[in-house]
Amino acid sequence: DFDNVPSSVMASDQYGNNLYSATANGKQVTTGYITQIGQTGTYIQFPINYLEQEWVSGQPWEYEFWNGGFAISNFHNLTQGDYQNQCSVYWPNGGHSGKNFAVAFGYSDSYNDSQATYDKCAKIYLTDATGYRVVTTNTPVKGTPKYGKFNSVWVCNTTYTYLVMKDGNSFTQGSLSAQKGWFKVVFVALDATGKPTGKEVEYYLANFDSSKDAESGLTNKIRTGWNQVDLSGLGDSVCTVAINFEGSDSSAYGLNTPAYVAIDDIDVTVNE
């Protein structure tokens, strides 16, 4: 769980001003939370993505939450359905087993990631105590991969995503119910080079499409509360898991539904 996370790597407010260089006041979260798994030599890391800023002059590489990644949070504002509340979970008690949880943000599709690198997805790394970090400026982060089996994780919708699915906003085509739409999170196993292994686990966060009732386990509803997801389908030897999203409400520029989910209580068996 995330109950022992130091305050220095947690979201400072429900927006997460300290997740961005311009508003962090010198206390920006970058490499994120990393913690040892039991008494093993394997650590699990939840960083913010370090990527090229394609639309910024000079195209520098920077840690910024808009690149995708994780925000460790304990905020649970249930009424504000916009990006200023992106670090809130739609659950009155915060996390699943305690107050804290992680918000995964970002997605990969043919528009923003034509090479299927999953570079804009939040990624969970199994690694050593050093973790994945910048070794050479303006190049992808590097680290030592460790391996294990991801058994399960608990997930919950964020307030922002839940309320946009429920009510729509200026970016969507209305509520998901009016569209008879759907939205799901996709856990993708990656190898040590960052390439997908071909193993994925899908979990629907909302469904109003009758043709997907059976596969989603949902009929005309948005998922509420914390729910456990079986991740064993990712395989027995995984070093990195990308968290991606797919949905029916999309345009030529990608998803219209906010690409967030809260996670907690990840169960991993390390290969040592």
Residues of each region from the PLM?
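N-terminal targeting leaders for non-cytosolic proteins
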Residues: 1-133
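Conserved long hydrophobic alpha-helices within structured protein cores
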Residues: 142-161, 196-202
